[in-house]
Amino acid sequence: VSISNYTELKDAIADFLNRSDLTAVIPTFISLAEADINRNLRHRLMENRATATINSRYSVLPTDFLEPIRLHLEGTSHNPLELIGLFEMQKKRAASQDVANKPLFYALTQSEIELFPTPNVNYDLEMYYYAKVPTLSSSTTTNNILTNHPDIY
């Protein structure tokens, strides 16, 4: 059975279930599978890259962000920013009186990254991260996981 798009996936699930009373909830099954994939799977097909100009203590994470792989300031790829916990971030700020300088560390906080030291000028940040799998629907009929590994669904 070839499964290459959302409709074929729904049809394959319906065939597997062999119960017409569950047809209406097949999209829910797919959504639950995607939630599990985003929570548990880390695969090269989920890797993404984003850039941003940073000039403040906090910077918003991409909306599809799951987990960092590597962050560095452009032009300094041999010196990636180091991921630290929020408690360690607080200790570093207190010890340095939060003097602005070139960022060396970052922490994850809700939908943002917190940088330390706070940037003293504009820096170009390059971020490699694991991205959420695009949600399948009638308008988004495929994604990298379905195309390359449909059995994960």
Describe the residue ranges of each PLM region.
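Glycine-enriched, solvent-exposed interface loops adjoining structured elements
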Residues: V1-Y153
